[in-house]
Structure formats: structure tokens, C-alpha cells
Amino acid sequence: MKKILLSISMLALAYTASANVPVIKSDPKIEAQVEQTLKKLTLEEKIGQMMELVTDLFGANDKNGVFYIDEHKTDSILSRYKIGSILNAPNTCAPTAKQWEKYIAQIQKISMKRIGIPCVFGLDQNHGSTYTQGGTLFPQNINVAATFNREIARRSAEATAYETRAVSVPWTYSPTVDLGRDARWPRIWENFGEDCYLSSEMGKAMVYGFQGEDPNNIDQYHIATSMKHFMGYGVPWTGKDRTPAYISPADLREKHFAPFLAGLQAGALTVMVNSASVNGMPMHANKDILTGWLKEETGWDGVLITDWADINNLYTREMVAKDKKDALRIAINAGIDMIMEPYSCDACGYLIELVKEGKIPMSRIDDACRRVLRMKYRLDLFKNPTQKLKNYPKFGGEEFAKLALEGATESMVLLKNEGNILPLQHGKKILLTGPNANQMRCLDGGWSYTWQGHRADEFAGKYNTIYEAFCNEYGKENVILNQGVTYNEKGKYWEENEPQIQGAVDAAKNVDVIVACIGENSYTETPGNLTDLWLSENQRNLVKELAKTGKPVVLVLNEGRPRLIADIEPLAQGIIDILIPGNMGGDALVGLVSGKSNFSGKMPYTYPKEINSLANYDFKKSEEVGTMEGAYDYNAKITQQWGFGYGLSYTSYKYSNLKVSQSDFRHGDIIKVSVDVKNTGKVAGKESVLLFSSDLIASMVPDGRRLRAFDKVELQPGETKTMTFELKADDLAFVDWNGKWRLEEGDFKLMIADQSADIHCTDTYQWPTANR
């Protein structure tokens, strides 16, 4: 009995110790400044720091439609409500850098005068300077994932931070680390795909890129991050944005929480909350998750912010509150620190009433305000609320453009290359067709100059569309543009004009090869919902008719999610998935098609083949039921068009000599895994080396395989390099039925390409803490 009691006591002590080790180390100087400021504030001023309004409320448009700051209106709002934060571009459209500099200087001057506390501005800089004209647009996050290159992620975030701080904005609502595990969901392209490890690594790299190494001292070239959308947002049961998700408790902890935990451990200063519900509980009302998992278990002292007006959803849609005041009570007590209430200050009055009525404790208001003030001190906003654009000479320059091109090039995935149709030789006549052949909007996607990205062609005119890039490389006289199908730019993202397929077919008679650029127009969030995952019938008919000409067809997929193309895939000799590569996407594609560059991207998600087979790569063996005999003769095979991690190259690679440092292991061990990779082709290339594991027998149904490590290597023809990974034995653990992390005794298999090794765990270990 004494031994049992001792074990229980030690488990409790271990849990307490773990919970009290904060993911961000406290800075005594900053904490003293925060407390000194906090004690000077009235209740109204504290609540004001918890509020975030949209920029539009602080100004108006002149007769030419150009936004300006109305200093009288700004003074009135800040004097009365003591607002602590402002978001979004005016008119939801990118101003120039000079305009941003002026807007924020005007507001900060009034804020410091009226409150003595600077506002903190936030923007959705989701793939570069998305809300500043003249800034750099990088590939979308799904492309970053396809590179399997952490340095691309980090350097892109560093450049984004530089250009964002250049216009005096110190905060971005990025990176998005939801797991895109439902192909129907309209925001897959905003995050890093379906795998929690890949998402964790890329998200962590971006946090370091945005913020730097020290979250307590963020310099003038870095900005605060907001990891989003916490959590379970990416797997709505309907596939539609902001609708409920149903996730097993084990998957919620093991997979969906993982990227957020990695970001917190990297020092992320803020987190944005999932707009919808998970397992019947709206996330904005879930105290167990928001306060328990996110704050108390990790010791995290950052800011938890709502998404757009989401507290209102608690009474208008989720029906867990009777009115707005009740919704505020629920959300703030659940752990919300900042309220994104874009167009209304009503919450200020309600919060004051709730505190005076004892329905929200003053300690909760102090905690929320303290967190906001802490972020502002960490950003050094009290001393430097604004920056000077002239001090940022690299803004919108060649250095960042080259980085955007590099990222786009490494992200594109070669899916098919029959008969070595690619690279396309010079001197050939090429037909460029399809709705994505001559639009910057399609290359940039949503969150590009505007929310839906619908004005990208207006702002990105100096960059090359796919057609323009082909003309530059192959000569305009050798490239014919006849799109056959076009988008209705005045309609919904999915609307197309009356097809002119015969015109494209006629044009194909005079060419050697057809390049069909198909996919989706730009969209984001709820406007991007769909009812059918198949690529549009018009576009598929275009490909079918062109294939009848007998000319070879290369498909270029330019889409935010994997639209089904099973009926036209066999008709193409070459297929390239460029995802959403940004302003340099046209040039990157042509560099690859011409052979000047080599493909190295790999699929960051599973590309489905059938509408009823949307499984992820880590599906469990029990999800795939083979044919049975007799009365129960049926087949439940999981089909895929292309698997996670799939991608071809102009060269070939041979893997050999897989070694592990130990065949037996236990909790706490580090297993060294090495493999030789040789470039056996005739051109140089980069190869992403992926290490997977399989738990062969477990007390809960195990995943078929899981990604555990990856790295990218560059090899010259004939060159061999040894890749070495240090695999933590604890990474082979899983979350069990009781919600506890558990590493079980038993057999495992490690796999890299066609190489494998068997290893054995000698002892079972269960963690006493919520997180490993």
C-alpha cells in the first residue's frame, strides 16, 4: 500500500511540476512594467484593452474613395472606450506602405495621448504582405508544406515580419495550423496539410521566423504571431466552413493539439480560437480547452483572441447563451482575453455590468488585460509604437522576390510524366488553355490584397501569369492562348462563363502540346464552401475534348483543395499540381516545365480519387475492409489518386543501407536512424526524405503509419549522402482511451521509401502529465 501511495504522490508531483513550467519564460522587467501599468487602469480602461475594432471605424473615404483617418472620430472612440487593438485594412483592401505609415501614426498619437497605451494593430498577413500594396506575396501555406523545407517556412515568415513591421503593424494572424484532414473544407490551402507532425514543424518554423528567438524581446524587424484556429477547425463534419466538428478525444489531444503546442513551445504570443464547435461544445465557450489545455497545462501567458465577431455566435447560432451579455459572460470566463468585435463597442458596457454583478470576477479581467499589456511590452510598443518605412530598404525588393520564387519552385509537385513529356523542349508550339492560364488571382488565392483575393490582377500587374511566363520563355510566337473555359469574375468563385471549348479544340490543331491550366478561382472561408468536390464539368469536358485531338496534354492543377479529376487523369501525359504559389508562381512553373529547375515538391495531403473515399494517409487498417466471401461479399477499399508525400522528379533516387542505432528501446531513448540516398539520374535534384513509423499491435487501434521525421537533401548526379535522424522513442507514443499519453511494449516498423527496419519497445510507460 505504501508503494502505491508513493507512486500516486510522485505522479501528482510530476504533473504539478510539468504544469508549472511555462512555455515562455517570464521576464521580471516586463512583468514589473505590466503590473505598474495595470494598477493605474480603471475597470473601463482594462476592458478597453480587451477590445479590438476594425480600422474602418476610425475614418472614412474621401470623394475619390481613398480612406483617411478621421481624427475627431478616432479621438472620440479612444477617449470613450479606451480601445486596445485595431485590425484589418481599410475597406478590406490593401493600402500602400506610405498610407499605412500615416494611418497608424495618426492613431497611435491619439491613443498615447488619451490612454497612454499604444494600440496593437493586427493583419492577416497569411502569405506575405497580403494587405500592403508593393509588398511580397509568398506561396500559400499549403505550398510551404509541399516543400518539406523548414528553412523556406522560416525565411518566408522572417521576410513577412520585416515587411509588416515596416508599415508599423506588429502583429499577424498567422500561421494557420489547423489540420486540413477533410478535402472538402475551403481553408485547406491556408494551413500545412493533413499531418500533425508536418504542421507542427512548419508552424514552429514560422513562429521563429515571425517573432525571432526571444518572445520577450521582439525587435523592430519581427512581429507577434497568432496561431489559429484553436482547435479542430479543419475537420467540419459537413466539410463547410465554421460548422461543427466531431473528433475523438484521443485525436484531439494527439493530433489537433500538437501543432499548437509546438507553436507555444516556440514562443507564440497569441492564439486565435476556432469559430465553430467541437463535440457539441463551442470552442469559445470551452473552459476546459481554452483555460485548461492551452493556459494551465502549459503555463502559457499569451493572449487568446476570438475570431471575427465569434462571441455573438454563442447566442445567434450555437444557442448556448440567451443574449450577447450572456455570451460575453461565458466566453470571458472560458478564457478569452481579447474580443474581435469589429464594428461595435457594446461589449464594453456589458462587461462592466457583468463585473459589477459578480458574474465575471475582477481577477479574470485583470488576467486578460495583463496578457494584452504583456504582449505590447514584449513588442516594445510603449517606446516605439510606430516605425519609419525608410528604415526598411528591403521592403518589396529583389531579395524577397527571389525567396518567393524559390519557395514556389520547391512547392510544385510533379504527379505524372508519361513518356518524359516534361520538360517541354524549346521550339514546340504550345496551346495554353483553361480558366487559370492567364489570371494572377488564381495564382495568389484568398488573402491577397483583399479578403477573397478578387482584385489580385489589379494589384499584381507587374508579375507574370502562366501565359505571360510561357511567352517569356518559349516566345510569344510559339504560345497560343485560348482558354475555352473562363471564370465569371463578377460572380461567385465557382461560377464560369459559357464555355467556348470548340475554339480551344480548333486552336489545338496547330500546336505540338496542350497545357491545360485548370482548378479553382480564389476564395476563402465560408464563400469557398462547395457541394461537389469534382472539378467543374466545364473544365473536365474541356480536357476530354482536347484529348480527342491526339495532341499530348499536360494538366496544371491550380487549386486550393484537391478537386476530383479521376475521369480526366488517364487522358493526360503530364500532371503538375502547383497549388496556390503566389505572385512568382508563373515564373516558377515555367522554370520547372522548361527544365531549368527540377521538381522537388511532395503532396502535403492525400489526393482523393472518389467522393466517398476521403481517408487521410494515416488511416487505420480497420478502415479498409477487403472482399469477403458468401452472402457478405463486399469491398471497402480506400482509393487514392495520389498519396501523402508523393512527388516525382526529372531525376531518380535510390535508397539503401537503412540503419538504426538500437533495435530495443524504452521511454526516454533516442534512436538514431540513417539511410543512404543516391541521385541515380542525369540531373541535379532535391529530395525530401520522409521517415514513417507503424505501431504493429497496440491496446487501441493504431494508425497505419505516421510521419516521424523529414529533411531535404540536394544531390548532384551520381552523388550519395547519408541522412541521419534522431527519433525520440517517446514520439512513438499515442493517446489512449483515458486521454493519457502511452508508449506501449511491442513491435514497431520504421520506413523510409522502400527501406524498413523492425524495432521493439521493451517496457510500457504512461505519462502522468497531460502532455509529453
Name what the model sees in each region.
Residues 757-772:
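Short beta-strand elements
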Residues 15-736, 742-756, 772:
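Glycoside hydrolase catalytic-domain context in secreted enzymes
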Residues 1-23:
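Bacterial Sec-dependent N-terminal signal peptides
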